[in-house]
Swiss-Prot record:
It comes from Exiguobacterium sp. (strain ATCC BAA-1283 / AT1b). Mg(2+) binds at residues 40, 69. It catalyses: XTP + H2O = XMP + diphosphate + H(+); dITP + H2O = dIMP + diphosphate + H(+); ITP + H2O = IMP + diphosphate + H(+). This is dITP/XTP pyrophosphatase. The lineage of its organism: Bacteria, Bacillati, Bacillota, Bacilli, Bacillales. Homodimer. It comes from the Bacteria.
């Protein structure tokens, strides 16, 4: 069964593809469709943005689409960067710049608790949607560690593993990550939803 992921982010594509392929899905993404329109993320929550992306792409393609909106919420920054995680340091969406700004804003801060949040929305061309949310609690480190992952992964420490998300192997990350948790919630409902 084909499923299109509504993202141009190669890191998200790789992570979601690794989780969806074993479920029997043939995964494509907006990277395979360079002419597909970009959705303006005007929502104020991860769920709203995921639904905007999924419903617009499903209507455009006439096919079921899975959209992810995810980000980092840092307690000492009142939940920022939140839905602006990708654009925290500016519209160019640079992981390095975002991480540098986060470290700058947390300079001298002892409360470094944070969470990754992922909202996944599966939409049909009819507009019917199924939305789930996954979170993982952690802390922000003082310097980037690890080569795997993307975004804030090199700074986000997973307490139970004493590693940053960027130090985790793909299989480890799939078990504990916010995206993995959301996908497991979706997994129980995805086949009936797609067939219904």
């Amino acid at each position: 069964m084909k499923l299109i992921i509504a993202t141009h982010n190669p890191g998200k594509v790789k992570e979601l593809e690794g989780m969806l392929t074993p479920l029997g899905f043939e995964v494509e993404s907006l990277l395979d469709y360079p002419d597909a329109p970009e959705t303006d993320e005007t929502g104020t929550t991860f769920e709203e943005n995921a639904a905007l992306k999924a419903t617009e792409a499903a209507a455009y393609f006439g096919h079921a689409v899975l959209a992810d909106d995810s980000g980092l919420e840092v307690d000492a920054l009142d939940g920022a960067p939140g839905v602006y995680s990708a654009r925290f340091a500016g519209p160019e969406k640079s992981d390095e710049a975002n991480n540098a700004l986060l470290l700058e804003k947390l300079n001298g801060e002892t409360n470094r608790t944070a969470r990754f949040v992922c909202a996944l929305c599966l939409a049909k061309p009819s507009g019917e949607t199924l939305t789930v949310r996954g979170t993982i609690e952690g802390t922000i480190g003082y310097s980037p560690q690890g080569e795997n992952g993307f975004g804030y992964d090199p700074l986000f420490i997973v307490p139970s593993l004493h590693k940053t998300a960027a130090e985790l192997e793909r299989d480890e990350k799939a078990v504990v990550s916010h995206r993995g948790q959301a996908l497991r919630k979706l997994e129980a409902e995805i086949i009936p939803f797609m067939k219904g």
